[in-house]
């Protein structure tokens, strides 16, 4: 029996609906044959009630990843842009190794950051941008 292909779990950037990624999703799945699962961030779009936070995004990502892991999926968790922050935040206990220690199947085998913010544990996005130029950047005729 052939080994099961790993599932790519794509977490979008801030202000990005999953629909923006449809061309990427279609090309990736058709050319590689790998399954791809997307996670819509709680912080994207207008919803009633209090504004969701990064922690709401991380908790939702963790719940989606856990469902896939419980189905035996081995995953590469990929965050684009802002998505790098909540995927970093949500990883505790979701790695394949951590789940195997608990007698569970499935889990995250790799984390991938696609032009994403990669904070250290407990660090916020602004700390990760420390030292970068701020404000408006002038451009000339060549960019």
Language-model segment annotations:
Residues 1, 32, 68-71, 93-105:
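Alpha-helix termini
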Residues 96-143:
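Flexible "cap/lid" loop of the alpha/beta hydrolase fold
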Residues 23, 89-93:
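Active-site signature of alpha/beta-hydrolase-fold catalytic machinery across serine-
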Residues 42, 83, 117:
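Catalytic metal-binding/acid-base residues of hydrolase active sites
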Residues 2-73:
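Active-site catalytic motif of lipid deacylating hydrolases and related acyltransferases
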Residues 75-76, 115:
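Outer-membrane beta-barrel proteins
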Residues 79-87:
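Gly/Ala-rich beta-loop-alpha elbow adjacent to hydrolase catalytic centers
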Residues 77-78, 111:
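Conserved alpha/beta-hydrolase fold motif
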């Amino acid at each position: 029996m052939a080994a099961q292909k790993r599932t790519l779990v794509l977490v979008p950037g801030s202000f990005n609906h999953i629909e923006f990624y449809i061309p990427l999703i279609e090309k990736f799945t058709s050319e590689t044959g790998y399954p791809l699962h997307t996670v819509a961030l709680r912080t994207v779009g207008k919803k009633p009630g209090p504004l969701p936070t990064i922690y709401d995004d991380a908790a939702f990502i963790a719940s989606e990843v856990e469902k896939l892991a419980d189905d035996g999926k081995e995953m590469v968790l990929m965050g684009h842009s802002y998505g790098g922050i909540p995927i970093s935040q949500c990883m505790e206990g979701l790695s394949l190794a951590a789940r195997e220690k608990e007698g569970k199947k499935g889990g995250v085998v790799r984390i991938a950051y696609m032009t994403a913010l990669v904070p250290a544990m407990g660090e916020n996005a602004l700390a990760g941008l420390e030292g970068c130029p701020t404000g408006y950047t002038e451009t000339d005729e060549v960019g």
